[in-house]
Design a protein with these regions (language model features):
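Proline/glycine-anchored alpha-helix kink/cap motifs
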Residues: 1-6, 44-51, 129-134, 149-164, ...
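Phosphate/diphosphate-binding glycine-rich loops and adjacent basic-rich segments that engage nucleotide
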Residues: 4-7, 12-71
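Flexible, glycine/charged-enriched surface loops at secondary-structure junctions
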Residues: 6-16, 75-96, 140-154, 167-170, ...
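A short, glycine/Asx- and small/polar-enriched loop/turn
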Residues: 21-24, 97-101, 202
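Glycine-rich phosphate/diphosphate-binding loops and the adjacent beta-loop-alpha structural elements
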Residues: 54-58, 140-142, 159-167
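Oxyanion-binding "anion nests"
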Residues: 66-114
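C-terminal, non-catalytic macromolecule-binding modules
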Residues: 123-140
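Internal helix-turn-beta structural module
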Residues: 161-215
Length: 215
């Protein structure tokens, strides 16, 4: 999504970290120097396919498999191709500090990509983890907006820094999104933000007139 704004970066996963021991590690590389372009991400359009990655570390491989199967069962209502990969380390070197599992899903649509995820925890069935992620994705897709409930707040920052007017359609005006908006107004008082909708954390449309010149 950030590539649409001209933000050039890459992220590589070295190892995962789960509560409480943590220990996760990623490598992020980015190129600076160019101005960000405004974003036009309002409606998602038709769903084309769904992908995903279900993982577990220091746990039996069937945990990741069950998460994936449960998610796929929920997502079949979309009637599109679904491919959820499974990642585990059973029987091989495992650099992780503690056990954990999770699943990330993404829906590729005509004009956007929306995601949903869930983490495992002690006493929580793998099937519940998969269903939670799939249900979250379906809920956001049902709004018809281009951004899921997590991307809705994160992209507001980049839109505020982009040169020009951005229009963002978010699945949910969460408390996080409202906090981001308040912070942008405090730090970048010249940036104009107009919000339509969003009552009771519902779908919303944001119009942001930003740019580094507003600093």
């Amino acid at each position: 999504m950030l590539a649409k704004a001209g933000f050039d970066f890459s992220v590589s996963l070295v190892k995962r970290g789960h509560y409480p021991r943590g220990g996760g590690e990623v490598i992020v590389a980015t190129q600076g120097g160019s101005k960000l372009r405004p974003l036009e991400l309002v409606s998602s359009g038709r769903v084309l396919s769904v992908g995903g990655l279900s993982h577990c570390v220091r746990l039996p491989s069937h945990v990741a498999v069950r998460q994936a199967r449960a998610a796929e069962e929920v997502l079949r209502t979309l009637k599109v191709p679904i491919r959820i990969e499974v990642e585990h380390y059973e029987g091989g070197p495992d650099p992780h500090l503690g056990p954990g599992s999770g699943i990330t899903l993404w829906a590729i649509t005509e004009r956007s990509i929306l995601g949903g995820d869930s983490l495992g925890e002690r006493g929580k069935p793998a099937e519940q983890v998969g269903k939670e992620a799939a249900s979250a994705l379906l809920k956001d897709l049902s709004t018809g907006m281009a951004l899921d409930s997590h991307a809705s707040d994160m992209l507001l920052v980049y839109a505020a820094l982009a040169s020009g007017t951005s229009r963002l359609g978010g699945a949910s005006l969460t408390s996080h999104a409202r906090t981001v908006i308040d912070l942008i107004k405090m730090i970048l008082p010249k940036v104009s933000i107009r919000i339509e909708g969003g009552a009771d954390e519902g779908p919303f449309l944001a119009e942001i007139q930003g740019g580094l010149s507003a600093l």
